[in-house]
Amino acid sequence: MRILYYDCFCGISGDMNLAALVDLGVPKKYLIDELLKLNLGSEYEIKIEKGQKLGITGTRVDVILKDEHHNKHELEEVLHNHEHKHNHHEIKNDEPAHSHEHHHRSLRDIEEIINSSTLNDKVKKLSLNIFMKVAEAEAKVHGRELYEVHFHEVGAVDSIVDIVGAAICIDYLKVDKILASRVQVGGGFVRCAHGIMPVPAPATVEILKNIPINTGIVQFETTTPTGAAILAANVKEFTQKLDFIIKKTAYGIGHRDLEIPNVLRVYLGEEESFQDIENQYILETNIDDMNPEIYGYVEEKLFKVGALDVFKTPICMKKGRPGIKLSVLTNEKSEREVLDVIFEETTSIGVRRYKVEKIMLKREFSKVKTEFGDITVKKAYYKGELVKYKPEYEECKDIAREKNVSIHKVYKAVYKQDLK
């Protein structure tokens, strides 16, 4: 399994992300040619070159706006020096115009630009997902409807390039899973249209809800709303554990000189593909006062609401009473309904809950032709080789009844086939 890991020890911004992914292996020409499909090429140029921060070499990306003769990162210098007079993504209002004349595009404008392009559907969808993260945050912060939001910085062409460029690069890398570390957001304060605001800015905080962060490593905004949205729209899990083999490292160089390297580090890794690991939960309870006939009914209901496995263990409880430990394996999605069944249908008044990692072999299902008809077979692979398989019991049972034959004959008919 191919892994992309973001090490955000100094945060993340749109340009640093683009630079890091180019440094990781996305060809410059491919990125530039794909971005031209947005039909915004007359508004900007991209400068991609090697750079260094505190001795670390990586790639630096500048999006140069043709109609302004300066780039986005000069604007960020103003913002980060607390002289900027607008929010990162401001609601359009009656305040004086931006000192740098950006196009203040709405979400609908951006959707039209992306949807009318010739980019592939996956890139379009991913780009829109990232923009939606920003739009939802801005709408929440400013108390507006989603499509009333007008962007300043993120609606400018340089930020559109950062976001759509991120989608292009992720699509090119063909990774199976994206992970990230805790996100460093920085500290201090920034002057915005509404006054002096703490770092991270309100929109950034909204985007980073439910995402683990670190603060205060420098008195500077290290994670921008664009960078936060790229993570929020793509990362499957935020973890400090690197449970994969690192194949390549790359660095996106930032534009500030800090006491720590102003870089975004990314890893391209390989996770052993013969197995998959899922985080699941065990819910269990000890019961010694329930009619044993009811267990079968309870088990049926548990499976119906999404339990992955149900098992019962004989136990000896206090005062020598025999009992049953009812254990249910479930995922987070079905946990609430599983608990409802346990509390409503058993005599339990308390449940133990703990998280487990389930390690699974890679599996697939296929049809096997037999003398009794087609039967579904589950195959399991280890290190790329088929190591075990078995027919689906319910199908074998139905065929045995329909054909009036022993179920053992149905199983044998499957195992006679050469499935390797």
UniProtKB/Swiss-Prot annotation:
The keyword Lyase applies. Residues 90-99 have a biased composition (Basic and acidic residues). It comes from the Bacteria. The keyword Transferase does not apply. Keywords: Lyase, Nickel. HAMAP family: LarC (MF_01074). This is Pyridinium-3,5-bisthiocarboxylic acid mononucleotide nickel insertion protein. It comes from Clostridium acetobutylicum (strain ATCC 824 / DSM 792 / JCM 1419 / IAM 19013 / LMG 5710 / NBRC 13948 / NRRL B-527 / VKM B-1787 / 2291 / W).
